[in-house]
Amino acid sequence: IISNLYDYVTGVEVGLGSNGRKNRGGHQMEDLVESYLKKAKLEYYKEMYLTEIEEKWQVNLSAISAEGTSTKRWDFVVKTDSCIYVIETNFYTSGGSKLNETSRSYKMIAEEAKNVKDFKFVWITDGAGWRSARRNLEETFNVLDTLYNITDMENDIFSKLFK
């Protein structure tokens, strides 16, 4: 119900509702990924900032943090005996600029992560939105060997990845 014509015209009420709908898929994807992390009996951390990772495991992530200027928060972090894995998850029901920008951003993170010893960036994404951004996804896939989707999780990728 629209309670204020001015807010509707300026997008306040519509925007808030739309943002909630847009984020719903992302939260559902996070929940799904978490269920597979639990199923694989992995020790993991949720919503961990880059600085928290640096402090907890005494690792220098300046190559990823733009020399300490980034405040990146990862959806999940898995720490094994030999590696720190940072995980980003998302699900896109439709295409658009957000999806393209995310792909470009994650491609850059993948390239930067290669400069950090015993550190891997993992991206788990899915959804029909990728049909319209196939080229962007392919470009990222070419530099990120840890790019997965829901089918990969169903096929137990975590037991192979987190050794």
Predicted regions, residues:
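Short loop/turn segments at strand-loop or loop-helix junctions that form parts
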Residues: 9-11, 81, 87-92, 126
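Short, well-structured alpha-helical interface segments that form or flank functional binding sites
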Residues: 24, 28-32, 71, 101-108, ...
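Glycine-centered loop/turn motif at secondary-structure junctions
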Residues: 41-43, 117, 144
